[in-house]
Amino acid sequence: MYVIAGLGNPGREYEGTRHNVGFMVIDELAKKLGMNVTKLKFKSLVGEGNFKGEKIILLKPQTFMNSSGEALYDAVNFYKIPLENVIVIYDDKDLDLGKIRIRKKGSSGGHNGMNSIIYLLNSEEFPRVRIGIGKPQKDLVSHVLGKFEESEKKLIDEAVIKAADAVIDIIENGIEHAMSKFNG
């Protein structure tokens, strides 16, 4: 069983923003896996299904970014899932736009959603897929809550597809394989 959480902020006003790239990847995964992420559970929009004999739970926390840990904590405790089977997908301002990075574990890198998750799970020992949103030209809040420029959309759309493929590869072939295939 895998719990896969894409981080973002709920509400129409945040759709398409840099901070919501995790939600975009969950939507892409749902499409690829034939799932609907519409049920409200664990303070999240949830989709449940199966892939290659594994139960898959897709989460889009509805707690707002800085409290993402509440949703993930509830799901992890409900399913009694080992942390190596929890995959978190989120934006990273320190990665170039459109780049993805997969890691087995690590710090929050200053990302408040990840701070919340690490604090509530009491561990940094879970896989994550980071999607580069580029360095801010202006202040950080305006950057992460801003929408992608028209010139950036093709690159970010490709990154979302690549990140979804990377998550599928983690499930099928393990994180080491996915890291060597997708970390460029």
Curated annotation (Swiss-Prot):
Pfam families: Pept_tRNA_hydro. InterPro entries: Pept_tRNA_hydro, Pept_tRNA_hydro_CS, Pept_tRNA_hydro_sf. Keywords: Cytoplasm, Hydrolase, RNA-binding, tRNA-binding. It catalyses: an N-acyl-L-alpha-aminoacyl-tRNA + H2O = an N-acyl-L-amino acid + a tRNA + H(+). Gene3D superfamilies: Peptidyl-tRNA hydrolase. Its EC number is 3.1.1.29. The record marks 9 as: Discriminates between blocked and unblocked aminoacyl-tRNA. The record marks 91 as: Stabilizes the basic form of H active site to accept a proton. CDD domains: PTH. The active site is at 19 (proton acceptor). One of its GO terms (molecular function) is tRNA binding. The keyword Lipoprotein does not apply. One of its GO terms (cellular component) is cytoplasm. TRNA binds at residues 14, 64, 66, 112. It is an enzyme of class 3 (hydrolase). It is found in: Cytoplasm. Its main location: cytoplasm. One of its GO terms (biological process) is rescue of stalled ribosome. Hydrolyzes ribosome-free peptidyl-tRNAs (with 1 or more amino acids incorporated), which drop off the ribosome during protein synthesis, or as a result of ribosome stalling. Monomer. Belongs to the PTH family. This is Peptidyl-tRNA hydrolase. It comes from Thermoanaerobacter sp. (strain X514). The lineage of its organism: Bacteria, Bacillati, Bacillota, Clostridia, Thermoanaerobacterales.
